[in-house]
Structure formats: C-alpha cells, structure tokens
C-alpha cells in the first residue's frame, strides 16, 4: 500500500521576509480565503501566528472597503 506524504507547511511571509501585510494586495489575500469567503486557519496554511493576525486584519479591512467580498454570492 502506498504511503501518503504531506507537503511540509511553511510561512510564506517569513520566507519572503514580509514586514507588514497590505490590505490593498488583493491577489495575495485571495489565497487565504475560501470560496465561501471565510479566512483559512493557520493550521491549514502554515502561517505563523503574527502573520495570521495581520492577515485577518488585512482581509477584514479589504472587505470593509469592498476590495474583497464577504461571501461568494449575495442572494
């Protein structure tokens, strides 16, 4: 039986030496929200706690400014 090997999680922001996550960088922020619009937890993405807090703050700010949607569909 074949063994399944998981990809090692790492923090992209630490690897790229990012100081502050920008709320205007919508392309990056879209990678950290689900199709339903929820913020993906750090246990799935591998993001460090410091950057996860910055990420959540940036996503919430960009939602408030209508750069990102709150949900996938508005009925």
From Swiss-Prot:
Gene designation: rpsR
Keywords: Ribonucleoprotein, Ribosomal protein, RNA-binding, rRNA-binding
Gene Ontology molecular-function annotations: small ribosomal subunit rRNA binding; structural constituent of ribosome
Subunit structure: Part of the 30S ribosomal subunit. Forms a tight heterodimer with protein bS6.
PROSITE patterns xrefs: RIBOSOMAL_S18
Pfam families: Ribosomal_S18 (PF01084)
InterPro entries, per the entry: Ribosomal_bS18, Ribosomal_bS18_CS, Ribosomal_bS18_sf
PANTHER family xref list: 30S RIBOSOMAL PROTEIN S18 (PTHR13479), SMALL RIBOSOMAL SUBUNIT PROTEIN BS18M (PTHR13479:SF40)
Example GO BP: translation
NCBIfam families per UniProt: S18
Annotated protein name in UniProt: Small ribosomal subunit protein bS18
Gene3D superfamilies documented for this protein: Ribosomal protein S18
Disulfide bonds: none
Entry's Gene Ontology cellular component terms: cytosolic small ribosomal subunit
Protein role: Binds as a heterodimer with protein bS6 to the central domain of the 16S rRNA, where it helps stabilize the platform of the 30S subunit.
Family: Belongs to the bacterial ribosomal protein bS18 family.
């Amino acid at each position: 039986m074949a063994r399944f090997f998981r990809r090692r999680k790492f923090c992209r922001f630490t690897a790229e030496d990012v100081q502050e996550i920008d709320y205007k960088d919508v392309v990056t922020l879209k990678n950290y929200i689900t199709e339903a619009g929820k913020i993906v937890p750090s246990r799935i993405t591998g993001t460090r706690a410091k950057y996860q807090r910055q990420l959540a703050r940036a996503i919430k700010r960009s939602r408030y400014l209508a750069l990102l949607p709150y949900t996938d569909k508005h009925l």
